[in-house]
Swiss-Prot record:
This is Yellow-related salivary protein M35. Exacerbates Leishmania infection in mice when co-injected with parasites and yellow-related salivary protein M10. InterPro entries: 6-blade_b-propeller_TolB-like, Royal_jelly/protein_yellow. The gene is M35. It is found in: Secreted. Residues 1-18 form the signal peptide. The keyword Cell cycle does not apply. The lineage of its organism: Eukaryota, Metazoa, Ecdysozoa, Arthropoda, Hexapoda. Belongs to the major royal jelly protein family. GO terms for cellular component: extracellular region. Gene3D superfamilies: TolB, C-terminal domain. Keywords: Secreted, Signal.
Length: 395
């Protein structure tokens, strides 16, 4: 009887935590509009990253060529065209942006404060048999202007040398616009910070100087081995720095950069003032530990609530922490928990204060996971509403 009551209490908690979170879309397989079904395998189209432009109400997805027969590597979905209450699994459209060169394989899109869509083309496909179709090239950062029709490409930078080492190890990246009021002007300064979870390094790109460099630190390394459990089997992962999120700007335009390793429960912080100066000695600060089995590969900061959100990989939950409080397990709350959140892979806070998070059921290892139910899920919730019932994350 005690066991039954415990299970019922857990299920009640799941529902309570999940009530305010809206399930927008979910897919078992993804179809692409305008591409003949015979030329692609819909089960191999697995988004790893998502970005939402609140002004156009457009979603953008990174669809890496991790498996064979993936016809496009960036897709879009108009939330105006598909009401999730009517259809949960809409097909995706080909990205309408005008790229000057074909994109090889994109894992994550990011929208910056200037309404530019940045993608990091890793320049290599994971399926060796398809490298004749998609020749390997240098990885590249590419930006598209979302304020103009057809999203023209407005910036491209090829990574070389140490910055291009092990591109399949690129994790999340953050775009730092120092002063959004100067978007598009000659004196605009923008930096991009790219995590590499294999090399345990952070790449810094200076857009104005067209230069990139690599930073190393022990805090970028995995603490040990983390696990992902599926169908009763534990799969081991050992990943270094994976997620990075930027905090509030000060008067000089500098910000805290929060980061975590995929195989760690600790959270660190670096001042972007150091990141932006080539050759600086890093002085990372250990903020604290989130607690047992809280490993995550993605995090997002909400400036309105002063809360960091974490997409935890094996716990199947989204947690939260208010940056005004000490980081310790007692101060970490949970806004969403569901057995259906299979490997949360990306999250973001849009310009209207909504938290978006996605799971795709496919950790970064070779074995492809099998699912009977829809495993690609995209969720949305207003940040203020998300923490309303979670006192630990309130200011």
């Amino acid at each position: 009887m005690k066991l039954i009551l415990t299970v019922l209490a857990f299920l009640s908690l799941q529902v309570a935590l999940s009530d305010d979170v809206g399930r927008l879309y979910e897919w078992s397989k993804i179809d692409i509009v305008g591409v003949r079904p015979s030329v692609y395998d819909s089960s191999n189209i697995i988004p790893t990253g998502v970005a939402y432009d609140a002004d156009s109400k457009m979603l953008f997805f990174g669809l890496p060529r991790k498996y064979s027969k993936v016809p496009i590597t960036v897709a879009q979905l108009s939330t105006r065209s598909y009401n999730s209450a009517e259809r949960r699994d809409p097909p995706l459209d080909k990205f309408s942006g005008k790229s000057k060169k074909p994109l090889t394989s994109v894992y994550q899109p990011v929208i910056d404060d200037c309404r530019r869509l940045w993608v990091l083309d890793v320049g290599i496909v994971e399926v060796k048999a398809e490298r004749k179709t998609y020749p390997t090239k240098n990885p590249a950062l590419v930006a598209f202007d979302l304020t103009k029709p057809d999203y023209p490409e407005i910036h491209r930078y090829e990574l070389t040398g140490d910055a291009a080492k092990t591109p399949l190890g690129y994790g999340g990246f953050a775009v730092d616009v120092v002063n959004p009021k100067k978007c598009g002007k000659n004196d605009e300064k923008t930096y991009v910070y790219i995590a590499n979870f294999v090399e345990n390094s952070l790449i810094v790109y200076d857009k104005k100087k067209s230069d990139a460099w690599v930073l190393k630190d022990d805090s970028f390394k995995p603490e040990g081995v983390s696990t992902y459990t599926h169908n009763g089997k534990e799969h081991e992962l050992k990943t270094g720095i994976f997620g990075i999120a930027l905090g509030d700007r000060n008067k000089e335009g500098n910000r805290p950069a929060y980061y975590l390793a995929g195989s760690s429960t600790k959270l660190y912080r670096l001042d972007t003032k150091l990141l932006k100066k080539k050759g600086s000695k890093l002085v990372p600060k250990l903020i604290g530990d989130r607690g047992y089995k809280t490993e995550a590969i993605a995090l997002a900061y909400d400036p309105e609530t002063k809360v960091l959100f974490f997409a935890e990989t094996d716990s199947r939950q989204v947690s939260c922490w208010n940056i005004k409080k000490e980081l310790k397990p007692e101060n970490v709350g949970v806004i969403y928990s569901s057995a259906k959140l299979n490997f949360a892979t990306d999250m973001m806070v849009d310009s209207k204060g909504f938290l978006w998070f996605m799971s795709n059921g496919q950790p970064p290892f070779d074995e492809k996971m099998k699912y009977e139910d829809p495993h690609i899920r995209l969720m949305k919730v207003k940040t203020k509403k998300a923490i309303k019932g979670e006192k630990r994350c309130q200011g």
